[in-house]
Curated annotation (Swiss-Prot):
The keyword Transport does not apply. It comes from the Bacteria. GO terms for cellular component: cytosol. Binds 1 NAD(+) per subunit. InterPro entries: Adenosylhomocyst_ase-like_sf (IPR042172), Adenosylhomocysteinase-like (IPR000043), Ado_hCys_hydrolase_NAD-bd (IPR015878), NAD(P)-bd_dom_sf (IPR036291), S-Ado-L-homoCys_hydrolase_CS (IPR020082). NAD(+) binds at residues 193-195, 227, 256-261, 279, 314, 335-337, 380. NCBIfam families: ahcY (TIGR00936), PRK05476.2-3 (NF004005). Pathway: Amino-acid biosynthesis; L-homocysteine biosynthesis; L-homocysteine from S-adenosyl-L-homocysteine: step 1/1. Disulfide bonds: none annotated. Its EC number is 3.13.2.1. The lineage of its organism: Bacteria, Pseudomonadati, Pseudomonadota, Alphaproteobacteria, Hyphomicrobiales. This is Adenosylhomocysteinase.
Length: 466
């Protein structure tokens, strides 16, 4: 482990390897490269001090270097203990960006690193957060509430909360008043994923959101592409790398049929699996049925299916009672943000055999075993390398534009959750068309007037559902 200077990575010697893969990724990320061309000279993020908490992958490296090219100072950690690509982290550290991320880091280290991305060398404060899942945002807000005298650190509900609270208490003791100062210095947060967005909306509804936020997840060019087409490619990749199991003919159960569930079902179906879906939402259930999937109760298929994947963003979707009933060597994994979709904590007193990194064999008293991928965390990033560069370019271009919006136009945003305007969503899509050889039909003035739009767009109303 390298700890010199202002970074923590597994092996700085991997930097050259990481740089080669970053160079390849740049050719697959036209949106981000276009941002460098368009905004590089003006440097709209000059003066921005961005704390980034997002999977430290090769694709994220391209995002980080785009933010730097636009004038920002950046400090970065991964938002998941298993999702870091160590060569990507090394390349970014070698380029001079403080990064704190190691694949397989402990939960204790995870929260130490989350603290470090707010600790600038000159003692200054971050003024922007780029978040994925909301952990960086919640770290600051919880600490500020504790400083205000609220009893928010006394009753942890999980091992992770216990570790988080301990880290907050450590910072409270070392730097009294720091959390409140840091909270008040934030101009805005841009949030990448469904789970983090839900956290922000809950804060906003309670009047507890202390700065503006942009919900990047619900940009069409994020949720309908990253969540769907990204999962369509990366889910099966993770299962294959983790297990080498043939999926053709297997029965796979996808829990949830939102955008991530849709992509996951398509991924497994494309690999030849016979896919069944569980859903609580009647609209999503109807979509699944009309897409040709049998919509079932988990309890009715738990003893017969071969593969189980959670995609919901909810907790306790697959519980210990379900896993006890699974057939021998059933594969269990999650592609939602947090590890509590599967009741992993309830498995800890059973016999675990580690097969290889992020693949564990868990044996029940009756003798049946399950294969658990990435300890219930994101298997596409834990067991593989996540979504392909091209689809992440769309997501990260949204992130870049959102950071520019909040940093350069603070007077236009109050302490609410916003979505990027439609013209920027369409811009992100346009930036990715040439790479695929797409040619757009041009509406005439008469055609545009007939449907009530500008010939140059936006082409859909804000409430249109793609």
């Amino acid at each position: 482990m390298s700890t010199e200077k202002d970074y923590v990575v597994a092996d700085i010697g991997l930097a050259d390897f990481g740089r080669k893969e970053i160079t390849i990724a740049e050719t697959e990320m036209p949106g981000l490269m276009s941002c460098r061309t368009e905004f590089g000279q003006a440097k709209p993020l000059k003066g921005a001090r961005i704390t980034g908490s997002l999977h430290m992958t090769i694709q994220t490296a391209v995002l980080i270097e785009t933010l730097v090219a636009l004038g920002a100072e950046v400090r970065w950690a991964s938002c998941n203990i298993f999702s870091t690509q160590d060569h990507a982290a090394a390349a970014i550290a070698a380029a001079g960006v403080p990064v704190f991320a190691i694949k397989g880091e402990s939960l204790e280290d995870y929260w130490v690193y989350t603290d470090k991305i707010f600790q600038w060398a000159d003692g200054g404060l971050s003024n922007m957060i780029l978040d994925d899942g909301g952990d960086a945002t919640m770290y600051i807000l919880l600490g500020a509430r504790a400083e205000a005298g609220e009893d928010v650190l006394s009753h942890p509900h999980s091992e992770e909360e216990e570790i988080l609270f301990a880290q907050i208490k450590k910072r409270l003791a070392a730097s009294p008043g720091w959390f409140t100062k840091q909270r008040d210095a934030i101009k805005g947060v841009t949030e990448e994923t469904t789970t983090g967005v839900n956290r922000l909306y809950q804060l906003s509804q309670k009047g507890l959101l202390p700065f503006p936020a942009i919900n990047v997840n619900d940009s069409v060019t994020k949720s309908k592409f990253d969540n769907k087409y990204g999962c369509k490619e990366s889910l099966v990749d993770g299962i294959r790398r983790g297990t080498d199991v043939m999926m053709a003919g297997k029965v796979a159960v996808v829990c949830g049929y939102g955008d991530v569930g849709k992509g996951s079902a398509a991924s497994l179906s494309g690999a030849g699996a016979r896919v069944k879906v569980t859903e609580a939402d009647p609209i999503c259930a109807l979509q699944a049925a009309m897409d040709g999937y049998e919509v079932v109760l988990l309890e009715d298929v738990v003893s017969s299916a071969d593969i189980f994947i959670t995609t919901t963003g909810n907790k306790d979707v697959i519980r210990i009672d379900h896993m006890r009933q699974m057939k021998d060597m059933a594969i269990v994994g999650n592609i939602g943000h947090f590890d509590n979709e599967i009741e992993v904590a309830a498995l800890r007193n059973l016999k675990w055999t580690n097969v290889k990194p992020q693949v564990d064999l868990i044996e029940f008293p009756k003798g049946n075993r399950i294969i658990l991928l990435s300890e219930g965390r994101l298997l596409n990033l834990g067991n593989a390398t996540g979504h392909p560069s091209f689809v992440m370019s769309a997501s990260f271009t949204n992130q870049t534009l959102a950071q520019i919006e909040l940093f350069t136009k603070p007077d236009q945003y109050s302490n609410q959750v916003y979505i990027l305007p439609k013209h920027l969503d369409e811009k992100v899509a346009r930036l990715h068309l040439d790479k695929l050889g797409v040619k757009l039909t041009q509406l005439s003035e008469e055609q545009a007037a007939y449907i009530g739009v500008s010939p140059k767009g936006p082409f859909k109303s804000d409430h249109y559902r793609y």
